[in-house]
Amino acid sequence: MTISIVTNSLSSTDNLQAYSGYNNQKQRLLDLGLKIFEFKPNPAIAQTLIDRYRSMEKSVPIFALHAKSLVVDGETAFIGTFNFDPRSAHLNTEAGIVIHDYDIARQIEQAIQQDMASENRWNAMESDQLQNVGFMKKLKVMLWGILPLEPIL
């Protein structure tokens, strides 16, 4: 079984609390054999994303992922904002939908594959993305990372 994940890089996110929680667990996930790809701050699909959401654009867009998309065995898909964490599970502030349809699952899988294309992501195991991040952002992630946030992340 292969599990591939595409998520936000530190460069592509403004949610430093969530990133710090993920960052604390990243090595464990890699050690388990997961393939982790992190979204670039300037993906090749940037113009497509801008055009798609132009009406929502109020300032310089941050190219981050928020929706969670999952395809299992090519025929079952999940799309939602649910974070697969205790906070989302217990406070019920997120939503998601499970779809059992091959054609829809295939379309979602193609969108995920596009996000994972090399021009849109970094390989979390191979790249040194921190060179693209300012000192203050690194410091904030480090500080968030030492707080006991595990129960809610």
Descriptions of predicted regions:
Residues 1-153:
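PLD/PLD-like phosphodiesterase catalytic module centered on the HKD motif
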